[in-house]
């Protein structure tokens, strides 16, 4: 380099004269001002090249001097040349060639240019931070009109206009949405008239407008073509302008601070963006072919270019992608949506290409502006995040993708606070089901996947947000579904852990807040306690309700599952005393006359058998693997193990019954149980004990021996005489029983049947009853006479083969068939013992031997005898015998009908599954032999059994009749077919009659054909017969019979329709429904005679009897619609007196024939087979799914025979008789006891549909038949609480709840003059029955509230419950005050807890509850029972907020809660540590305080304006309890429960009261420090504020993101949004007094806003002066600052923007001028931090000349490796260097060179006990900030320094680090290589 420099000098010397001449000329012109002499000095900012370089040395410049080596002209120098001395010792050659080659490269100039640009930019970056304080001047404000304001914004949008000119003044009053809209438009806002023109102008260069737009008008086209398209303000200039506006506002308004300006800017921006989102609304439009498909999406997102260069392309692409998605599903066309609506939903903005591009560009500009404002801390995070969450929650399907992008950008902020994450989680649970319902997965575009992913992120990162009672109450189904989806997608171990977390952690805590018992607690002790706490009245009511339901699943759950499923082998199950009361209830229910039906005895016997052996009751109508007949096998009980000995209970119950029967009525009237047992029917006892004996539960032999031992079998003379005089040994009525002087046991001994007993037992029985009698006994004579009558009544069963064959040929019995009641009088007068022995020894063997010769009617006649004798065991044996063999069609129909008709008996006997399987075998057999008729009957039987067993509707989907064009066309075809069908029907009827009249044994040529051939003539009327033609034939046949009024055509029509039914498909019910509905219309529209109606009803009756027509279908589509229309004309005053023929009498006659079997009539109307068919069909009408239709028909009949009806008196009597018999029948009584509320509602709804009908009177008439003791039969004014309580005895409790609903509704519907009296009556009645109805029988109270349709009545009951609860709480607290040391006694012995009470919370709760028993716990038990009752009552409202109006009682309860919490805090103030833990557990689990609070929070009337102080006290008390629990390590469970309660309170507080509590809450949260960081984080999530400012550790300041990321040019520290380096004065250094003030909203302005003084705290904004080193500004820097031009002199370099950048974006970047400086006392600006959470450490600021001083916290939770990773990183530039060494601090130089300094970590010391502990190192700073030292509780080891420059093999000598006084000794083996 020297040689090239000399050559240049010599070459320049050749041009010396010219050079001197130019110097002379320059001296002449500049003689007055000579230039300064050049000084060879480097600039002050340039670091030296090398530590050994001269002070004034300039690189590559060597001036001549005397004695220099180049002047040596010796011989050696001349011969060998000059060898220059190397400037650096390790440089051995010249760099001229390398430099010359580099300069000759093609890109040399570009490279040099880039280097110079970087140099200039770097100097500008460094000089920007050195602007003097007096140069920060805010601009002045001016008020501009609209035109000038538009011009100002236009200039702002023009990049060529310098900001210097715009900065001279700032518009005043320019704010709101108008500000952002003008920034977007880039000038004046377009008016309404020119809005379209502006849009066209803007997109003129991009989009070709439609042809109509160009030809609209000449002026418009001219203006559009001449006006230039507007351009939005660039994002950097827009941010500068907004900041300038805020700075001007701060400087002009004294009372305004950044805390108010920033939220205002944020609110305006959110409102502006909300208007844009609102443009994407969905509009319903008519579907058309031209718009059926969606608008085409853009080809690629690249067509939508950003309007400003600063718009981020990534955000724009996301917006375009979202827009592309939002276009397609917004149409919701049939191709992409399952909706069948004729209209579609479209978004007009996205349907138009121009509007779409305008909206997307504007939205992209909004997002870019929002991001930059947020980066500059010009937006309030809390306001912004809250708006985004609210907008996301209220968005539709089109808006959802755009708001989803916003949510993803602020998701981390959302997860930080519960006030954001809870509404966001609620929004997800609403939006995901909405997307599922509106969009299919193929068209959702991954939207649902994104939503589910967000749900998963929320659940994983903020699991505490799941603990929300309202969330689980309102969105339980969606939440459970999504959690199950997440578990399915997660691998098995992780999914199992997630499932356990939800079930074991989340659900118990949520159930605690909802006051629900957690289902997961299934321990034995808990179940025993539950059974012990179940009151006897409630258990009695539940047992009777289960028995009345006749639902085997319910009976199994109430009686068997509690004892056999979970604790099958518990001692409690084998305790006979526990079951004594329940067995007594079962026996009484089975035999009392307060219930009806022999089925009760069979159900009770089966249930007692299962209880005795401890087996569950399993019932199913589905197919089983094999056929088993356990009910017919009497040996199966011998293999079972007895668990309960029920025989002593039976004997005791029989004794009580006998005592009750022998007492007088007046004596037993005062005793409830005695009066109840007096209603027991002895005949029912005989059936029950006989069934128990057959099942092996009751031993007849032991019973007989017991009676013989007690001498109760010796007959008296009077009794023997009485036997001959009155041979009725069965004694079927209570009156005859009481007339007998024999004991009940002796009568039972005579009547009980014997099943498969040996002859010795019969002989012993004869000896016990008749003694030594050798003659024929009374029973033998009765059996002989009854057998003779039975053979006479059933000759086909006992006759010879010829006679049986003759009886089989008969189609129907002769009209002179005797009445079975009179024909078998001897049989009915005999005892049950005689009847059962006669059936099993004579009847059943004879029938079984001749079963092939029987027909359906004969089988039905035999079954009628067995049913009248209540011998269902014999009938079951007969059915099993029949179904086990192939049957004829006639016999199979009768057998199937008996299976359906007595299905309830078979279910009670637990043989339904066996019979069901036998029917299924018949179906398989008939299908295999292609017997279609029998297969159809078997399949129909299985479907009807499923309806009866499982309450599943049968396969009927009959649609309403549509009187449209299709119906009219079909009717025209039917009318056209009538003549031909009439002729064919007459011919077929004539053939049928001739075949019947002729002898059956002689084949007649006139006999009609069978099968499909009979339909051939009818089908020949059509060219191509099909299903529609069959329907026309069927309808024409029915119309012909109806129009011709000829009953002789009915048999032929039945045969034809039956054949059509047999050949029809599964849609036969729909076909029948159509022509039945057509019949109703034709009857209503025309006048038909009674003969026609009777012929039609006869046809329908025969079709029902034949099984062709479904009675349920006929009721729904014909009978009920016709009755409703007829009765409406009767009740309507306008049509009541019109002369319209009514056929109600004919319908009632047909219904009487159909319901004869169900009403208990023994004389058949037509035949026994028809009775069985009608009975099977009517049984379906009494099923729960079909019962409303039957009750509606009964309601119509009641209205028809009412006093105001115009029906003739003769018909009224007939209708009333049938209706009363129907409502009093056994099936109706059973159905009414099953669902009393369903019956009342069906009657009431029917009455409401008929104008002029009185619902109350109709209900009273119906209840007189259903329940003669009903309260509704009394006057409402006479009903008091005592009468209601008398009915609440368990037997009528469910009915009472239904009656009370009707009573309260009637009290509300009184006249206005009696309204006050009715209200008083309602209140008195509700108050009087509240305890009995809601406390003792909570299920009935809950049912009452559930059935009430009046919200006012529900709120009244709720108010009464709250008042009673408040009174009991007050009484309990008064009793507790009498014993002030109650709490001290309650927690004695509770001081020895484990490390964490969260793992043993149930045990501690039980301990606390046991300890509380030392005090007066009676009041607390009453409070608890009342509380549970109120909760159960309120939960029936099906809303999270309970409807109530008693605000005073609610306030009293809340005041009690707050007082209890404050008392608990006071008692814990002076207690010891263990005492505090015990008291805390007692407050949580040993009292009702928190349960009361959780209940009161759900009342809607609780909060009002007067509750501010009480709400604040509640929050403070809960927060203090939470703090105390969090500070104790062993109180983890208590802390979680208290945190849940506090969160619950904050969630339910209204905004007006929440604003009162927030200041105190935020203040306490800033000062609370808990035991663990995890608890602190959980508690901090309750805060409602987001820190808008950032700490110096996490943020940097740079001119742009590119400068920071690419060049690494930035300054550490947060950005003050109002510290505008261009116009605001720089704030001074913070003082210690101001260091503690926190700026929560981003920056808190000081007293002098003009000077820009900002007070910052540990989480506030850190100004630039606060992070600069005290020695950063030197003398040379000051001179440089003074030499720079000011803000008013036009320096343009200062107009670069400040941008705050998170440090995480930079990563770890090490450059020459930016060296990562880890915290160390050796560094000039270093700090020592022991935790990553900088916001949780106390900050200590020194004097004005000091840098930031940061205190440290304990590092006991981190080991050495974690502590090293926890050290924060700071980046220092040349401006902040302290002591320099070659341009960088010595510490940074050593770190770069590889000198590894061990950080100051906590050292391990040993205490006196020998345990190892950790003591943290702390960095302290004196007030002057002169030096920093490290102090610790123990002496540290010296830090070892490894110098990689030491190459000697020997050991490195000890040296002292210049800034780190640490000595290190090491060898070469420990040196790091370059790779390391």
Swiss-Prot record:
The keyword Nucleus applies. The keyword Nucleus applies. Residues 1-10, 1394-1405 have a biased composition (Low complexity). InterPro entries: Mediator_Med12 (IPR019035), Mediator_Med12_LCEWAV (IPR021990). Keywords: Activator, Nucleus, Repressor, Transcription, Transcription regulation. It is found in: Nucleus. GO terms for biological process: positive regulation of transcription by RNA polymerase II. Residues 1373-1387 have a biased composition (Basic and acidic residues). Signal peptide: none annotated. GO terms for cellular component: mediator complex. Residues 1867-1876 have a biased composition (Basic residues). Pfam families: Med12, Med12-LCEWAV. One of its GO terms (molecular function) is transcription coactivator activity. It comes from the Eukaryota. Residues 1-75, 291-314, 715-737, 1373-1405, 1801-1876 are annotated as: Disordered. PANTHER family: MEDIATOR OF RNA POLYMERASE II TRANSCRIPTION SUBUNIT 12. Component of the SRB8-11 complex. The SRB8-11 complex is a regulatory module of the Mediator complex which is itself involved in regulation of basal and activated RNA polymerase II-dependent transcription. The SRB8-11 complex may be involved in the transcriptional repression of a subset of genes regulated by Mediator. It may inhibit the association of the Mediator complex with RNA polymerase II to form the holoenzyme complex. Component of the SRB8-11 complex, which itself associates with the Mediator complex. Belongs to the Mediator complex subunit 12 family. This is Mediator of RNA polymerase II transcription subunit 12. It comes from Mycosarcoma maydis. The lineage of its organism: Eukaryota, Fungi, Dikarya, Basidiomycota, Ustilaginomycotina.
């Amino acid at each position: 380099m020297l040689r090239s420099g000399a050559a240049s000098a010599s070459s320049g010397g050749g041009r010396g004269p010219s050079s001197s001449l130019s110097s002379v000329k320059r001296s002449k012109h500049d003689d007055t001002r000579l230039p300064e002499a050049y000084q060879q000095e480097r600039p002050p900012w340039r670091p030296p090249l090398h530590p050994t370089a001269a002070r004034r040395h300039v690189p590559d410049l060597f001036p001549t001097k005397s004695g220099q080596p180049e002047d040596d002209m010796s011989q050696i120098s001349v011969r060998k040349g000059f060898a220059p001395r190397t400037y650096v010792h390790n440089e051995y050659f010249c760099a001229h060639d390398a430099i010359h080659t580099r300069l000759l490269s093609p890109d040399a100039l570009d490279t040099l240019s880039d280097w110079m640009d970087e140099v200039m930019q770097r100097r500008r970056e460094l000089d920007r931070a050195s602007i003097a304080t007096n140069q920060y001047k805010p601009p002045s404000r001016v008020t501009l009109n609209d035109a000038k304001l538009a011009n100002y914004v236009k200039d702002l949008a023009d990049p060529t206009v310098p900001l210097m000119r715009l900065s001279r003044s700032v518009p005043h009053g320019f704010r709101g949405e108008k500000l952002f809209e003008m920034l977007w438009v880039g000038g004046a806002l377009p008016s309404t008239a020119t809005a379209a023109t502006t849009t066209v102008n803007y997109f003129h260069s991009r989009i070709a407008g439609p042809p109509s737009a160009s030809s609209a008008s000449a002026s418009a086209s001219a203006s559009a073509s001449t006006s230039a398209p507007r351009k939005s303000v660039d994002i950097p200039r827009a941010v500068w302008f907004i900041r300038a506006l805020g700075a001007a506002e701060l400087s002009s308004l004294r009372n305004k601070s950044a805390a108010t300006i920033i939220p205002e800017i944020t609110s305006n921006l959110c409102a502006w963006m909300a208007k844009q989102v609102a443009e994407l609304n969905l509009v319903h439009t008519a579907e058309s072919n031209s718009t059926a498909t969606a608008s085409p999406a853009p080809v690629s997102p690249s067509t939508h270019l950003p309007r400003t260069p600063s718009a981020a392309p990534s955000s724009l692409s996301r917006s375009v992608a979202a827009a592309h998605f939002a276009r397609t599903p917004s149409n919701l066309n049939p191709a992409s949506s399952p909706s069948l609506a004729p209209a579609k939903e479209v978004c007009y903005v996205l349907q138009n290409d121009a509007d779409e591009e305008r909206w997307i560009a504007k939205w992209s500009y909004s997002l870019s502006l929002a991001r930059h404002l947020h980066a500059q801390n010009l937006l309030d995070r809390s306001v912004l995040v809250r708006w985004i969450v609210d907008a996301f929650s209220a968005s539709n399907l089109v808006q959802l993708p755009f708001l989803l992008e916003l949510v993803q950008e602020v998701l981390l902020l959302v997860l930080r606070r519960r006030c954001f994450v809870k509404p966001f989680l609620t929004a997800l649970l609403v939006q995901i089901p909405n997307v599922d319902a509106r969009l299919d997965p193929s068209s959702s575009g991954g939207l649902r996947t994104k939503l589910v992913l967000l749900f998963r992120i929320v659940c994983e990162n903020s699991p505490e947000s799941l603990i929300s009672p309202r969330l689980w109450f309102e969105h339980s189904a969606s939440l459970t579904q999504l959690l199950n989806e997440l578990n399915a997608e997660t691998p098995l171990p992780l999914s199992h852990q997630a499932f356990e977390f939800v079930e074991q952690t989340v659900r118990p805590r949520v159930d605690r807040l909802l006051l629900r018992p957690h289902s997961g607690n299934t321990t034995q002790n808990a179940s025993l306690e539950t059974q012990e706490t179940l009151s006897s009245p409630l258990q009695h009511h539940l047992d009777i309700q289960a028995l009345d339901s006749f639902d085997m699943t319910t009976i199994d759950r109430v009686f068997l599952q509690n004892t056999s499923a979970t604790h099958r082998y518990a001692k409690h199950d084998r305790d006979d005393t526990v079951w004594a009361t329940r067995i007594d209830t079962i026996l009484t229910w089975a035999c009392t006359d307060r219930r009806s039906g022999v089925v009760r005895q069979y159900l009770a016997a089966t249930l007692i058998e299962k209880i005795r052996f401890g087996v569950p009751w399993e019932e199913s109508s589905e197919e089983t693997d094999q056929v088993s007949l356990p009910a017919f096998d009497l040996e199966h009980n011998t293999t079972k193990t007895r668990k309960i000995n029920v025989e002593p209970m039976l004997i005791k119950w029989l004794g009580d019954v006998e005592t009750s029967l022998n007492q007088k009525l007046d004596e037993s009237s005062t005793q409830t149980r005695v009066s109840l047992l007096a209603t027991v029917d002895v005949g029912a006892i005989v059936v029950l004990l006989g069934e128990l004996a057959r099942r092996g539960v009751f031993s007849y032999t032991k019973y007989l021996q017991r009676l013989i031992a007690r001498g109760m079998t010796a007959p008296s003379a009077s009794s023997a005489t009485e036997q001959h005089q009155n041979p009725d040994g069965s004694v079927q009525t209570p009156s005859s029983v009481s007339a007998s002087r024999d004991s009940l046991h002796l009568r039972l001994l005579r009547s009980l049947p014997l099943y498969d007993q040996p002859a010795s037992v019969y002989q012993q029985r004869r000896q016990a009853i008749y003694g030594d009698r050798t003659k024929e006994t009374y029973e033998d004579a009765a059996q002989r006479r009854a057998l003779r009558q039975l053979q006479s009544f059933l000759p086909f069963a006992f006759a010879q083969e010829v006679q049986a064959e003759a009886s089989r040929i008969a189609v129907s019995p002769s009209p002179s068939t005797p009445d079975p009641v009179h024909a078998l009088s001897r049989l009915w007068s005999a005892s049950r013992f005689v009847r059962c022995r006669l059936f099993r020894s004579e009847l059943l063997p004879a029938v079984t031997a001749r079963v092939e010769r029987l027909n359906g009617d004969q089988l039905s006649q035999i079954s009628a005898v067995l049913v009248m004798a209540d011998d269902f065991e014999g009938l079951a044996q007969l059915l099993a015998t029949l179904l086990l063999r192939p049957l004829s069609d006639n016999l199979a129909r009768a057998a199937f009908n008996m299976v359906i008709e007595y299905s309830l008996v078979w279910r009670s006997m637990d043989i339904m599954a066996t019979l069901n399987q036998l029917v299924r075998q018949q179906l398989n057999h008939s299908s295999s032999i292609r017997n279609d008729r029998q297969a159809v009957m078997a399949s129909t039987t299985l479907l009807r059994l499923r309806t009866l067993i499982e309450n599943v509707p049968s396969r009927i989907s009959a649609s309403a009749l549509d009187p449209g064009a299709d119906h009219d066309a079909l009717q025209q075809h039917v009318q056209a077919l009538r003549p031909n069908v009439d002729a064919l029907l007459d011919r077929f009827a004539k053939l049928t009659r001739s075949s019947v009249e002729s002898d059956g044994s002689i084949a007649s040529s006139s006999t009609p054909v069978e099968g499909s051939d009979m339909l051939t003539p009818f089908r020949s009327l059509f060219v191509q017969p099909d299903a529609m033609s069959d329907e026309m034939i069927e309808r024409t046949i029915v119309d012909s019979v109806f129009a011709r009024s000829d009953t002789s055509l009915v048999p032929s029509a039945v045969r034809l329709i039956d054949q059509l039914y047999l050949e029809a498909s599964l849609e036969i019910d729909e076909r029948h429904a159509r022509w039945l509905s057509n019949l109703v219309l034709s009857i209503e529209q025309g006048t038909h005679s009674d003969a026609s109606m009777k012929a039609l009803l006869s046809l329908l009756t025969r079709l029902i009897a034949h099984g062709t027509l479904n009675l349920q279908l006929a009721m729904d589509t014909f009978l009920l619609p016709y009755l409703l229309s007829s009765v409406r004309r009767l009740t309507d005053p306008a049509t009541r007196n019109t002369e319209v023929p009514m056929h109600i009498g004919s319908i009632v006659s047909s219904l009487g024939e159909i319901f004869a079997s169900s009403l208990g009539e023994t004389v058949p109307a037509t035949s026994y087979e028809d009775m069985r068919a009608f009975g099977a069909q009517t049984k379906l009408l009494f099923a729960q799914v079909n019962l409303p239709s039957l009750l509606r028909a009964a309601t119509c009949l009641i209205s028809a025979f009412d006093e105001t009806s115009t029906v003739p008196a003769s018909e009224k009597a007939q209708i009333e008789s049938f209706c009363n018999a129907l409502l009093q029948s056994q099936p109706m009584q059973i159905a009414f006891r099953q669902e009393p509320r369903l019956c009342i509602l069906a009657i009431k709804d029917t009455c409401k549909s008929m104008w002029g009908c009185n619902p109350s009177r109709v209900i009273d008439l119906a209840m007189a038949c259903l329940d003669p003791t009903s309260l509704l039969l009394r006057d409402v004014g006479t009903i008091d609480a005592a009468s209601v309580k008398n009915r609440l005895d368990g037997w009528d409790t469910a009915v009472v709840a239904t009656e009370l609903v009707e009573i309260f509704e009637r009290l509300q519907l009184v006249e206005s003059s009696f309204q006050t009296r009715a209200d008083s009556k309602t209140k008195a009645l509700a108050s009087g029955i509240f305890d009995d109805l809601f406390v003792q029988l909570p299920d009935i109270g809950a049912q009452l509230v559930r059935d009430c349709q009046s919200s006012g009545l529900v709120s009244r009951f709720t108010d009464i419950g709250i008042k009673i609860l408040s009174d009991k709480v007050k009484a309990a607290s008064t009793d507790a005050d009498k014993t002030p040391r109650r709490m001290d006694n309650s927690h004695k012995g509770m001081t020895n807890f484990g490390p964490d009470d969260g793992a043993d919370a149930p045990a501690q709760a039980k301990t606390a509850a046991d300890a509380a028993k030392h005090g007066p716990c009676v009041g607390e038990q009453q409070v608890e029972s009342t509380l549970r009752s109120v909760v159960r009552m309120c939960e029936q409202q099906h809303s999270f907020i309970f409807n109530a109006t008693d605000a005073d009682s609610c306030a009293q309860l809340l005041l009690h809660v707050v007082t209890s919490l404050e008392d608990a805090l006071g008692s814990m103030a002076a207690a010891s540590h263990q005492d505090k833990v015990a008291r805390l557990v007692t407050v949580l689990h040993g009292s009702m305080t928190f349960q009361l609070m959780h209940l009161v929070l759900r009342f809607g009337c609780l909060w009002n304006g007067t509750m501010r102080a009480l709400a604040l006290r509640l929050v403070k008390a809960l927060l203090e309890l939470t703090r105390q629990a969090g500070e104790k390590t062993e109180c983890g469970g208590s802390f979680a429960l208290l945190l849940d309660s506090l969160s619950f309170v904050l969630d339910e507080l209204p905004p007006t009261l929440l604003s009162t509590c927030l200041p105190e809450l935020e203040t306490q949260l800033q000062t609370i420090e808990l035991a663990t960081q995890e608890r602190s984080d959980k508690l901090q999530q309750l805060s409602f504020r987001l820190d808008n400012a950032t700490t110096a550790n996490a943020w940097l300041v740079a001119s742009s993101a590119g400068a920071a990321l690419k060049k690494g040019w930035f300054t550490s520290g947060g950005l003050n949004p109002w510290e505008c380096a261009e116009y605001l004065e720089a704030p001074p250094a913070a003082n210690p007094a101001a260091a503690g003030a926190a700026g929560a909203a981003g920056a808190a302005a000081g007293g002098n806003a003009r000077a820009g003084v900002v007070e910052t705290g540990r989480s506030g904004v850190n100004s630039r002066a606060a992070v600069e080193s005290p020695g950063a500004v030197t003398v040379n820097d000051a001179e440089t600052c003074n030499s720079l031009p000011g803000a008013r002199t036009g320096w343009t370099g200062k107009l670069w923007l400040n941008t705050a950048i998170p440090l995480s974006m930079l990563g770890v970047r090490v450059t020459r001028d930016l060296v990562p400086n880890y915290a160390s006392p050796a560094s000039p600006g270093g700090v020592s931090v022991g935790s990553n959470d900088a916001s949780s450490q106390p900050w200590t600021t020194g004097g004005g000349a000091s840098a930031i001083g940061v205190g440290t916290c304990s590092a006991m939770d981190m080991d050495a490796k974690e502590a090293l990773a926890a050290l924060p990183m700071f980046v220092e530039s040349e401006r902040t260097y302290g002591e320099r060494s070659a341009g960088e601090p010595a510490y940074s130089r050593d770190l770069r060179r590889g000198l590894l300094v061990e950080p100051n970590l906590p050292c391990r010391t040993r205490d006196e006990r020998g345990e190892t502990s950790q003591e943290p190192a702390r960095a302290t700073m004196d007030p002057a900030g002169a030096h920093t030292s490290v102090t610790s509780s123990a002496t540290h080891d010296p830090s070892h320094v490894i110098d990689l420059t030491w190459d000697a093999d020997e050991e490195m000598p000890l040296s002292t680090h210049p800034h780190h006084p640490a000595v290190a000794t090491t060898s070469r083996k420990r040196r790091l290589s370059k790779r390391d």
